Structure formats: C-alpha cells, structure tokens
Amino acid sequence: MARIAGVDLPRDKRIVIALTYIYGIGEHTAQEICAAAGVSEDVRSKDLTPEQQEKLRAEVDKYRVEGDLRREVSMNIKRLVDIGSYRGIRHRRGLPVRGQNTKNNARTRKGAKRSR
C-alpha cells in the first residue's frame, strides 16, 4: 500500500483517483502530479514501483496538503474573526459567509430549527 503525505492510498484504484484521497489534491492536480512524476494515470497504486512512489512523494511535497492546508484555512478564518470583518462575524455567528439568503434556507449552516 502506497503511503504519500501521511495517507494510505487505496490499492485497487488508479493512481489519479487514489491521489485525490489526500486532502488538498483534486483530480486536476492529481493529473498534473502524475505528468510531472512521469507516472501513467492508468497504473493502479498497488502496481507502483518504489521509484515511482518516491517521484510521486517528491511532487506531492511541492503542494500544500493535509495538515498544513487545514492549518492555513483555519488560521485564515481565525484572522477574519479576530479583525472583526463582516466575514469573520458571519463565521463567529455560524451563518452563511458568502451572501446567501437566510430567511428561508441556510439550515445546514444555522443548525436544526428551534421550536418557539
């Protein structure tokens, strides 16, 4: 089982799909990583040679993924909350941040309906 960026990749999936199991890597980025590493997109992760795994690890290390990316996103939200911007206030109150209506919808963000 290939382990890249602290994530065990599924063995029976194509490497392009398996790379998307890493937080911060989507399908397009996975294709770019495979091309840069010189690995065919059709190869299964169980069939990777150790050299190919090392090349993929080196390419993935160039991106901000997993813990570093999660930390950066949470720090960005914390910064918005600390400076008291409109977006920070919306985060603090648990309301939609990007201008969506809240009269009828936004149940996911607001939580379960409170009975009066």
UniProtKB/Swiss-Prot annotation:
Residue spans of biased composition, Basic residues class: 106-116
InterPro entries membership: Rbsml_uS13_C, Ribosomal_uS13, Ribosomal_uS13-like_H2TH, Ribosomal_uS13_bac-type, Ribosomal_uS13_CS
SUPFAM superfamilies, per the entry: S13-like H2TH domain (SSF46946)
Chain intervals for the UniProt region annotation (Disordered): 92-116
Top-level taxon of origin: Bacteria
GO biological process annotation, one example: translation
Keyword tRNA-binding appears in the UniProt entry: yes
GO cellular component: cytosol; small ribosomal subunit
A molecular function GO annotation: structural constituent of ribosome
UniProt keywords, alphabetically: Ribonucleoprotein, Ribosomal protein, RNA-binding, rRNA-binding, tRNA-binding
Quaternary structure and interacting proteins, as annotated: Part of the 30S ribosomal subunit. Forms a loose heterodimer with protein S19. Forms two bridges to the 50S subunit in the 70S ribosome.
Stated family: Belongs to the universal ribosomal protein uS13 family.
Described function: Located at the top of the head of the 30S subunit, it contacts several helices of the 16S rRNA. In the 70S ribosome it contacts the 23S rRNA (bridge B1a) and protein L5 of the 50S subunit (bridge B1b), connecting the 2 subunits; these bridges are implicated in subunit movement. Contacts the tRNAs in the A and P-sites.
Record's protein name: Small ribosomal subunit protein uS13
Source species of the chain: Lactobacillus delbrueckii subsp. bulgaricus (strain ATCC 11842 / DSM 20081 / BCRC 10696 / JCM 1002 / NBRC 13953 / NCIMB 11778 / NCTC 12712 / WDCM 00102 / Lb 14)
The encoding gene: rpsM
